Amino acid sequence: MQKIPLIVIAGLTATGKTDVAIELAQLIDGEIVSADSMCVYKYMDIGTAKPTKEQRQIVKHYVIDVVFPNEDYNVALFQKDATKAIDEIYQKGKIPLLVGGTGFYIKSIVDDIEFPEMGDSKQVRQNLYKELEEKGNMYLYEMLKNVDSKAAQSVHPNNVKRVIRYLEIYFLTGKKPTDFLEKVRKKGSKKYNILPLCFVMERSLLKERIDARVEKMFKIGLVDEVKMLLEMGYSKDLKSMQGLGYKQVIPYIEGNITLEEAKEELKLRTKQFAKRQSIWFKYQGDFIYLDVGNLEFKEVVKKCFELCKSVV
């Protein structure tokens, strides 16, 4: 069976993946599958740095706006949606590009990961967020320590989303999260001929990029977007509303912090997120790492285009 060519553009937030991918897709007659765990949510555009409608008119994108903010979405669902999209793109005679910064989403395709079955997590998650609101994050963290000390050691108590995710696994499967995740099988993709690119950047330059991106988000209407979501009835406790760009703005809307404090908090959290991404991607040895920090946009596109010739 002939393998499907697949161009992967992964990497750190604010390194220009989207713009390069759109330009590259036009050069190789491709379409883009988004690999971003926040871009799946409808109505959440600015805080997720989602490709604009204009960009999506230039090059078709998949796995964007697939669920409402109060609906569940996870890596297993992404794998199913992305695989379908890649097949559809290839059947049209075009080249699929998998683009984003959510590492586990990308690895689910690149490694063809096989996920054990889990039940519906919505009610469990709601109960855990209620516990969080009433008793605080340390209560949940201590709960995780009692359930699985190894999992607790791997996560900071303030990383509430990850703590809750681990507890979900326990309550849905009855197994320790670490035991459950060890059963996730990496088969290695036999279906795709993959060019795995990963954009990286020197830390000080990346921090400047992040600061500029956050300022732009506020300038083009991030606060109004978060207000709109709250007015639509989407709770601040939802998984989607706990994401970067939303969680940091809500205290400002509630009158608890100033606008400048909200900006600084988002900048800080985004930099921390980028650091976690950097560590994660650093240990994924199957990527070709491109330092895009000191390259002109056209140079990055050209370099990617030349590398594409090995699989296209």
Curated annotation (Swiss-Prot):
Q: Positions of the site: Interaction with substrate tRNA? A: T102, R125
What Gene Ontology biological process does one annotation of this record name? tRNA modification
UniProt KW Cytoplasm keyword = no
Name the chemical reaction catalysed here.
adenosine(37) in tRNA + dimethylallyl diphosphate = N(6)-dimethylallyladenosine(37) in tRNA + diphosphate
Give the EC number(s) under which this enzyme is classified: 2.5.1.75
Query: Keyword annotations for this protein?
Result: ATP-binding, Magnesium, Nucleotide-binding, Transferase, tRNA processing
Q: Which positions does UniProt annotate for ATP binding?
A: G11, L12, T13, A14, T15, G16, K17, T18
Q: Which family does it belong to?
A: Belongs to the IPP transferase family.
Q: Quote the protein name from its UniProt record.
A: tRNA dimethylallyltransferase
* Species for this entry: Caldicellulosiruptor saccharolyticus (strain ATCC 43494 / DSM 8903 / Tp8T 6331)
